[in-house]
Amino acid sequence: MQHHHQGSYGGGGGGGGYPGQAYREQNPYGYGQQSPQQGYGAPQQHNGYNQPPSGYGQPQHNGGQMYGQRQQGMWLRVRIASRDRKFLTFALGQYQNHYSHPHQGGPPPPPSEPVAFGHGAPQGYNFQYSRCTGKRKALMIGINYFGQKGQLRGCINDVKNMSTYLNQNFGYAREDMVLLTDDQQNPMSQPTKANILRAMHWLVKDAQPNDSLFFHYSGHGGQTPDLDGDEEDGYDEVIYPVDFRQAGHIVDDEMHRIMVQPLRPGVRLTAIFDSCHSGSALDLPYIYSTQGILKEPNLAKEAGQGLLGVVSAYARGDMGSMVSTAVGFLKRAAKGDEAYERTKQTKTSPADVIMWSGSKDSQTSQDAQIAGQATGAMSWAFISALRKNPQQSYVQLLNSIRDELATKYTQKPQLSCSHPLDTNLLYVM
């Protein structure tokens, strides 16, 4: 197991003022019960499933401007200033997804219409960006492992800093945040495996298009041999609850099953992992560099019967069947190249899932001693970059985060997504 925080803990804290009670009131499963491990389906709200959310208007810009829009592989969308504001789309032989200022107002907002996955995906398999104008919920986990071998110093600070930032700058209400840290007296607020899994279910329950969900983990991360054959490096990424010695770790496949697969189109889940081996902690298949260059699955090559079953369930609006089909398909997969090539397709999502991770899978996360507090380097850099400029595109923000880290660290955070991402769009949350 890797360690990623050193230094002195500069915050103390007894969890005062954090919404343990609000969480229990909203918890659909009831604290103290076993978290539901079987038959976890998606919200049963299918009306208008394939329709864009109401009030989801066109981007309101003035003047002519161009911005990159990935659609069906290599395309560029050109905004034409005209009375009826039509869009014209031109095919290009090659599209370089580097940022150029589209207009004086900054990067354009996400599009309102569903977007095709492209790259060989079956027809009708679309995803939907979220405009993050709906309900906000956040789950934040910080574990210092007090009294254990490998005790950390900064993880609770990470959670307190992030929760304050989200509350003051992004409209996340305290009563809609759940903080699990191992300095709290309430046993339901301890970051045990059972509490973490239960809180993950709470986070995504009843999420609607344009809602904005936020997940933050700061603690030990590691790798374990991959039993499904779906990881390129042969290892699953894991996180370690405070009681991992008794209850065990939580594998990336399980986090993906709980927090990504049930989400409807247009729901945003933003995840930040400040831990070792967190580069693919949510098993998201699309990965971006600072130039916006994309690592993506070839859906044409990999669209086997398993994916088609998932897509047909998706087209019917049958999210429960989609989840069970995907999980069953993963369990049936054989080890080796075939398993990896086939299963990463089921890790796509019609929702809008974005992950900022503090290290690539092959790296070990670093720590920082910032303003007298031991703090996770990724958490600190994310907040610092957005404070300096809240109006950035995805690729600008990724570069800004790396610039923040470059003064002290060799760590290179990465941006992962559940769908093809136009990294020139405005980052919203």
UniProtKB/Swiss-Prot annotation:
Active site: H220, C276
Compositional bias segments (type: Gly residues): 8-19
Organism: Aspergillus clavatus (strain ATCC 1007 / CBS 513.65 / DSM 816 / NCTC 3887 / NRRL 1 / QM 1276 / 107)
Protein name: Metacaspase-1A
Nucleus as UniProt keyword: no
EC numbers on record: 3.4.22.-
Family: Belongs to the peptidase C14B family.
Pfam family, any one: Peptidase_C14
Gene Ontology CC annotations of this record: cytoplasm
GO molecular function: cysteine-type endopeptidase activity
Keywords: Apoptosis, Hydrolase, Protease, Thiol protease, Zymogen
The protein's role, per its UniProt record: Involved in cell death (apoptosis).
Domain of life: Eukaryota
Any single GO BP term: proteolysis
Ranges of compositional bias, category Polar residues: 46-62
Region (Disordered): 1-68
Low complexity: bias regions: 20-45
